[in-house]
Amino acid sequence: MKASELREKSVEELNAELLGLLREQFNLRMQHATGQLAQTHQLKQVRRNIARVKTIITSKAGA
């Protein structure tokens, strides 16, 4: 997910995206805790995507 793609979305769409990413992060963390997650790099990717979305939401709220 690119930041330029996220900037084109509205705040409502970004909030929906954030909610989906938080759910995905929860599921990945549960899989990791139970030893079912083979691709542990996904945790890092989702965490960074959450940060991207939150950053853009904050910048749009300030503008």
From Swiss-Prot:
InterPro entries documented for this protein: Ribosomal_protein_uL29, Ribosomal_uL29, Ribosomal_uL29_CS, Ribosomal_uL29_sf
Annotated signal sequence range: none
Gene Ontology molecular functions: structural constituent of ribosome
Keywords: Ribonucleoprotein, Ribosomal protein
Classification via Pfam families: Ribosomal_L29
CC terms in the record's Gene Ontology section: cytosolic large ribosomal subunit
Gene Ontology terms describing biological process: translation
CDD domains with a match to the protein in the record: Ribosomal_L29_HIP
Family to which this protein belongs: Belongs to the universal ribosomal protein uL29 family.
Family annotation (NCBIfam families): L29 (TIGR00012)
PANTHER family: 60S RIBOSOMAL PROTEIN L35/50S RIBOSOMAL PROTEIN L29 (PTHR10916), LARGE RIBOSOMAL SUBUNIT PROTEIN UL29C (PTHR10916:SF0)
Protein name: Large ribosomal subunit protein uL29
